[in-house]
Swiss-Prot record:
Biased composition regions of type Polar residues, renumbered to the chain: 470-489
Organism lineage string: Eukaryota, Fungi, Dikarya, Ascomycota, Taphrinomycotina
Entry's Gene Ontology molecular function annotations: 5'-3' DNA exonuclease activity; 5'-flap endonuclease activity; double-stranded DNA 5'-3' DNA exonuclease activity; double-stranded DNA binding; metal ion binding
Region (Disordered): 464-489, 530-559
Gene this protein is translated from: exo1
UniProt family annotation: Belongs to the XPG/RAD2 endonuclease family. EXO1 subfamily.
Organism of this sequence: Schizosaccharomyces pombe (strain 972 / ATCC 24843) (Fission yeast)
Region (I-domain): 114-245
Record's subunit section: Monomer.
Name under which the protein is recorded: Exodeoxyribonuclease 1
């Protein structure tokens, strides 16, 4: 569950990072976090106790992704329940039952998407699911440890013993246990948010420079897995009380005087037990192969306190649980002869190792998890076509064939004509580029050009009509002649030349080039010709007073610098 609002409070210390920054190091992973995310893929099957192993793919994908970036993962799973979390586990069980009933009702009504959401909330990750994942991880050479009780305390202990260099989790109370480097919200590509203990101690905000003791007390006051805390108290309120009363007992006495807070009668005892669970919970030591405390207690604990943080059991059972041979809840060995276990052991190994991974090609690394039918296919592009030469086309000699080719070019895509010089198989290779080349079999042959096409002639006639409608005011401008069907090179050059406009003529009126004039340009020509020697309007607006009304309202002179109502509205 974590501490509600803790990540939001520590947002200034959050840094966006990537797991590749930890290349060459070992990171501990909360395995149950991956399993809880993976149950979304098969929530319906797990809710109705159907055999499935779909949830293994997500966890294995994440572990292989860490290996790809040079990180050595160490997966840690939860063990048996703590007596101090009995009330929390009971509430979670009730919520799961309610979600299952609601999901079953939605499934019967045909609302399958909503039902699957409820089924994913009601699924409880069991030690059998963790055991299957342990076997699958071993096939890929990935190590794992099952904690005697909670994976949070086990991960922090491994970090204190320098067995791991950081922790990947979604549980914010990892910081309350005393973790130094925590990676939150890691996606399937390695992007994550990193919070380091040193950043909290050196925060710019003095109020957030929290030592580990104050951070732990603040979390207990607002509520955690081991106590519900004080009703109506959040993290900021708890921090304010701790800053005013550094001693927890004094802060609790001050809280009782606040009428807006509801402090339980036995909260002092709950606070002490929760503080013990965060500091001295029992964990497994891989070096000594035995159970130890997260941190050695300063005094001898009572029987009730010792049971609250997890009772002690013999070393052989601790080894069997840590290595995944025994169930951490029932303390019994897993029955491999069970039919479900036998079917799993036969099918789990199908998730084969990935070999020959190139670090520069991440797409090949994750491509094996995609079925061949759903893999993207590379489409043929123009670059893929080899030995293709550009075929030069010839202009038509006669006007009739040229008009037909121009008309066909406007109606459909241009088609390369066939020629005897084409290599065999060229049309087949070109079919990937142009579909029209294969559809149109009878393409007319275009002979070499002699003369000018009628298209340019029609264009010149159009320009001539426009020049007649918009006469030029410059005497130096000479219209382009378009009398003959064939234009000489000299006429062709003059038709594309620009005349120097007369300074006395309006703008754009003396240009005699033969480019086609748009409708908007023609409107501009007409407007300038109607007003001789007119210039384009400037941005400066000269105010003209309105005509005086028949009955003036006021004849008082207006002071200099004061705008009239018409001027004000116009501006």
């Amino acid at each position: 569950m974590g501490i509600k609002g803790l990540l939001g409070l520590l947002k200034p210390m959050q840094k966006s990072s990537h797991v590749e920054e930890f290349s060459g190091k070992t990171l501990g992973v909360d395995g149950y976090v991956w399993l809880h995310k993976a149950v979304f893929t098969c929530a319906h099957e797990l809710a109705f106790n159907k055999e499935t192993d779909k949830y293994l793919k997500y966890a294995i994908h994440q572990a292989l992704m860490l290996q790809y970036y040079g990180v050595k993962p160490l997966i840690v799973f939860d063990g048996g329940p703590l007596p101090c979390k009995a009330s929390t586990e009971q509430k979670r069980k009730e919520r799961r039952q309610e979600a299952f009933e609601l999901g079953k009702k939605l499934w019967d009504e045909g609302k399958k998407s909503q039902a699957i959401m409820q089924f994913s909330r009601c699924v409880d990750v069991t030690p059998e699911m963790a055991w299957k994942l342990i076997i699958a991880l071993r096939e890929h050479g990935i190590e794992s440890i099952v904690a005697p009780y909670e994976a949070d305390a086990q991960l922090v202990y491994l970090e204190k013993e320098n067995i791991i260099d950081g922790i990947i989790t979604e549980d914010s109370d990892m910081l309350v246990f005393g973790a130094q480097t925590v990676l939150f919200k890691m996606d399937g590509f390695g992007n994550c948010i990193t919070i380091r203990r040193n950043d909290i101690a050196n925060a710019q905000d003095l109020n957030l420079r929290l030592p580990i003791e104050k951070l732990r007390h603040m979390a207990i006051f607002s509520g955690c897995d081991y106590t519900d805390g004080v009703a109506g108290m959040g993290l900021k309120t708890a921090l304010r009380y701790l800053q005013k009363y550094p001693e927890p007992r004094a802060a609790i006495r001050a809280m009782r005087l606040d009428k807006s807070l509801k402090v339980p009668v036995s909260f002092e005892k709950e606070f002490a037990l929760a503080d013990l669970a965060f500091r001295h919970q029992r964990v497994y030591c891989p070096k000594d192969k035995t159970l130890v405390h997260l941190s050695p207690p300063e005094r001898e604990l009572s029987v009730h306190e010792d049971a609250f943080i997890g009772s002690f059991f013999d070393n052989q059972l601790a080894i069997d649980i840590a290595e995944g041979r025994s169930n951490p809840i029932t303390k019994c060995a897993f029955d491999i002869k069970d039919s479900s276990m036998q079917s799993f052991t036969k099918t789990t190994i199908t998730i084969s190792k990935r070999k020959g991974i190139s670090k520069t090609d991440i797409s090949n690394f994750f491509m094996k998890s995609i079925p061949p039918s759903k893999r993207p296919t590379k489409s043929t592009s123009l670059i893929d076509v080899t030995n293709v030469k550009v075929q030069r086309t010839h202009l038509a000699n006669d006007i009739s064939s040229e008009k037909q080719s121009i008309k066909s070019a406007n109606e459909k895509a241009y088609v390369t004509p066939k020629s005897n010089s084409l290599k065999p198989g060229f049309g087949k290779s070109l079919s990937d580029i142009s579909n029209s080349a294969t559809k149109n079999e009878n393409v007319p042959f275009l002979p070499p050009r002699t003369g000018v096409s009628k298209y340019f002639k029609l264009q010149k006639n159009t320009e001539k009509e426009i020049d007649e409608q918009v006469p030029s005011q410059s005497n130096n401008t000479t219209p382009t002649s378009a009398k003959s069907d064939s234009a000489s090179p000299q006429n062709w050059f003059s038709s594309f030349s620009y005349q120097t406009p007369n300074s006395a003529s309006p703008p754009f009126s003396s240009l005699s080039h033969t480019l086609p004039i748009s409708a908007l340009a023609k409107i501009g020509h007409d407007a300038l010709n109607r007003k001789n020697h007119a210039s384009l309007p400037s941005r400066r607006i000269v105010y003209k007073p309105p005509s005086s009304p028949s009955t003036p309202i006021s004849m008082n002179p207006r002071p200099k610098g004061i705008l009239s109502l018409q001027q004000y509205k116009f501006r």
